[in-house]
């Protein structure tokens, strides 16, 4: 700040208590701002709290925040007399708001402002002797959130429990995680062998089986590799794979081992291996820290042992199993996943050859049957293979067919379709019918809104066509091109009348591959969008949205609250789009999820409130348009802080002018000396 030069001497000192009370008036600030101010005012190391490191920690926690600073300057000056003393108080405040730009993260409701402030309070207490008055007030009501700075004391401290049914879908992840095997022998004497055709491992019990781990980019520090067995078939997948009682209780392979006797998979030659049993699901797995490949190699080798036969009664009992190998961070986040089938047997080479021959015969038989629809004799020659007999053809539901696919991306897409069709068989028929009815109601509801928007009164006939064409040239902002929610908010109100007829389905639900079952044979897909471009950049079409309660809660990361809605007969978002916070509280929804659901309802309302094009195209973010109930949406990752500077300047006249202001120091000293002598 700039100060006027004065011939008066300047003295700076700490302000009086009434000034401190004025600054800390709680009515002017939120409790989070008061928290920052009380912490900084009580600390003996104020510079540490005002240093850029504290705000950098918050900045890093929000990854890529939207930061806005609003400076506030206040000046209080007593009216000075001519050449007299003055008392000047200057307060400079910076109101800082940092908000995460990615509000679609399903985990963001768990990282509340209160949880972050509690973690910062712990860091501040560790670095200074100051304490906050909010520690005791909010200790019991605070939402527990992990500290963004704290690191686990051990590699395996923060591992999250595995789901009830682990995923068996291959996922290379951001590091191109892959699992492979060395060139194996098919001889009967081989202790292990791997079939790339069947994607299946054959090995003997308690024999070393090397597995090669490969990544294209190094994973984060402290990454681990987990190996977990699961049953392959759907009727057994919920059971935990363990050793049979015979091998578990025998002394063979158990004496002198650190691994629990019930674990099927063991790691050999790694003293850092840790055997984990999930306390909720009971699934057993073994973890080893990830080690980068040695010089001259591109693989990291892990030696695994399988401690029970697939045919053991009381254990696997001839049920096929899958081995899921995942690359995870120290807090349990999956960075990559690979899966393969395993069979533990006495003669791996023999069993592999038998399985491969059987599958080849099955493929030849299927291709022959599909090539000619007429019945063929039981004895025939096909490609040089003598078919002495053909078994009775299975029913279409039990028949296994194999489709060779070129390219992993195509394979994973077909695999998702296959899994979706299989899961469809487990749904009851009334659930399917309800879903189709919801889709039809949603389709009709959006069509009605579309019709009301395209009415002539909505556009008005006073504006000339040239003005309408100019509105088409207005381009959306970058945030609207990136944010899918605002992309859905683009409506036909920004399109001229001449072009509105060509896009009757704008803003409606476009059926995807998963919605084909909801269309009757008489219904047709919406016509393709035809939008003649009048500029070099055309806004993208809106994304299709699923307005069911299940999808709505899944997008918010609140899937656990589904029962609170379904028990009341609420199945679509349109049934709760007018709900308030009191309505959500009446449903007995937990408070930590209530704010997130309320924020999602507000966003849904915003998407269906068709405003003028200028509002849609000039809005910098969705957060600025949601003003209703802003005090109730504190669950988002938004941090408000106030950084202030208080300076009080008192100016005194020169010493030779003190007599004019009855401020003679020599006279006061003489008076005090006389009082002292009289007292003696």
UniProtKB/Swiss-Prot annotation:
Effect seen on changing residue 319 to H: In EEC3 and SHFM4
Annotated spans, Transactivation inhibition: 610-680
Region (Oligomerization) residue spans: 394-443
Outcome when changing residue 643 to A: Increased transcriptional activation in a luciferase reporter assay
Residue span of region Interaction with HIPK2: 352-388
GO annotation terms (biological process): apoptotic process; cellular senescence; chromatin remodeling; cloacal septation; cranial skeletal system development; determination of adult lifespan; DNA damage response; ectoderm and mesoderm interaction
Intracellular or extracellular location(s): Nucleus
Post-translational modification, as annotated: May be sumoylated. Ubiquitinated. Polyubiquitination involves WWP1 and leads to proteasomal degradation of this protein.
Phenotype upon changing residue 646 to P: In POF21; results in increased transcriptional activation in luciferase reporter assays; affects oligomerization
Record's keyword annotation contains DNA repair: no
Co-factor binding details: Binds 1 zinc ion per subunit.
UniProt-reported outcome of changing residue 643 to Q: In POF21; results in increased transcriptional activation in luciferase reporter assays; affects oligomerization
Pfam families in UniProt: P53 (PF00870), P53_tetramer (PF07710), SAM_2 (PF07647)
Protein name per Swiss-Prot or TrEMBL: Tumor protein 63
Native source species: Homo sapiens (Human)
Gene that specifies this protein: TP63
